[in-house]
Amino acid sequence: MRVKYFGTDGIRGVFGETLTDELAFKVGKALGEIVGEGRVIVGKDTRVSGDSLEAAISAGLTSMGVDVLLCGVLPTPAVALLTRITRSFGVVISASHNPPEYNGIKVLKGGYKIPDEMEVKIEEKIESGYFPVRSVVGRTKSFREGRDMYIGAVLEIFRDLDLTGEMVSLDLANGATTTTAKEVFEFLGAKVEVFNDSQDGLLINQGCGATHPRFLAEEMKNGKVGFTFDGDGDRVIAVDEERNVVNGDRIIGILAVGLKEEGRLNSDTVVGTVMTNGGLEDFLKERGIKLLRTKVGDKYVLEKMIESGANLGGERSGHIIILDRSTTGDGLITALELMRVLRRSGRNLSDFAKEIPDYPQITKNVRRTERMSLENENLRKIVEESTSRGYRVVIRPSGTEPVVRITVEGKDREEIEKIVEEISRVLES
């Protein structure tokens, strides 16, 4: 069966349109049938629709005899950690970096996003419309101590990191890291300047956060380094002391060098995606580090990491997984690991980042239509000809939006623009 509701990062849509309370209730019942008489940990970001979806999912779960532990506002990686500690299932209600009108449902088990096969199983149960009547009804309970458990775990990981004297600026995207990031940095000794720390559900990701890093670059006043998170806290982008944005590729490059120097980089291998910049690949190759590429999506990065034995991988967007620290992308852990590498080296972030080439790369979204075909002879010729001239072309349907993304990378920006427009015309014709 083709997956109907789940995309590359769970179920996602505009609340009240493609994502409804009715669907959330059914997801809860379907998941509840799989879980049995166990428990599910539920967290959410700050979106207004989060309360409604939380109630609907909880109702579905409890009707199937499952107890629900409500964490309230908590980052996705925090819920993942809690499911790993308790060996249980979890649900995160979040649309990550998307605007406030969107929301989503992510399902976790034992620290990881559930595999495709389990997503299909949930799909099939929803589509069948049949759910057995359970003699036992579950209960919902507050689990606000989950936040403290997560913060405690992060502080234990970085127990030797002393940030005394560091000036750090944080853009919390008015999202889930409002409950964790500032407190952790301050506990480790940093002086913290905070932006966008509201839990008003209408402001999440609005002109701020990891998808708008220029906000922090322009507004930070006191920070020697800045970190900007997305709505659910699984992404992070950095800003250096010269107010330059340091994207996920460059963060991965810095971490790879730091981990290799410590003897912590498994197999001297890093996992990226088809969107990973060629500049990072060249930088790593010069230092004896191999880059493996996979499909876009942190779940696919994780799969390739487990398959290859790598412990570092991620995406340009700031989804970065450090597998000996966390089982999922965790913006806060990534930021702290970067601070640790910088402190050990005694170097500024800008010095490190400038060593990593970032070849010109243009991405354009084209609205996906029913008649649009990626199996197009003219398209194939453009891609082959461009590739033969040293340009890297990636054309892929988005897993979270109804668009096709065209990405072209190379060393001549004007030529890249021409290739992108040529491909756009073919797709739209």
From Swiss-Prot:
The modification Phosphoserine is found at S96. It is an enzyme of class 5 (isomerase). Its EC number is 5.4.2.10. InterPro entries: A-D-PHexomutase_a/b/a-I (IPR005844), A-D-PHexomutase_a/b/a-I/II/III (IPR016055), A-D-PHexomutase_a/b/a-II (IPR005845), A-D-PHexomutase_a/b/a-III (IPR005846), A-D-PHexomutase_C (IPR005843), A-D-PHexomutase_C_sf (IPR036900), A-D-PHexomutase_CS (IPR016066), Alpha-D-phosphohexomutase_SF (IPR005841). The active site is at S96. One of its GO terms (molecular function) is phosphomannomutase activity. The keyword Nucleus does not apply. Binds 1 Mg(2+) ion per subunit. It comes from the Bacteria. Keywords: Isomerase, Magnesium, Metal-binding, Phosphoprotein. PROSITE patterns: PGM_PMM. CDD domains: GlmM. GO terms for biological process: carbohydrate metabolic process; peptidoglycan biosynthetic process; UDP-N-acetylglucosamine biosynthetic process. Its cofactor is Mg(2+). It catalyses: alpha-D-glucosamine 1-phosphate = D-glucosamine 6-phosphate. The keyword Metal-binding applies. Activated by phosphorylation. GO terms for cellular component: cytosol. Catalyzes the conversion of glucosamine-6-phosphate to glucosamine-1-phosphate. Belongs to the phosphohexose mutase family. PANTHER family: PHOSPHOGLUCOMUTASE (ALPHA-D-GLUCOSE-1,6-BISPHOSPHATE-DEPENDENT) (PTHR42946:SF1), PHOSPHOHEXOSE MUTASE (PTHR42946). HAMAP family: GlmM_B. This is Phosphoglucosamine mutase. It comes from Thermotoga petrophila (strain ATCC BAA-488 / DSM 13995 / JCM 10881 / RKU-1). The gene is glmM.
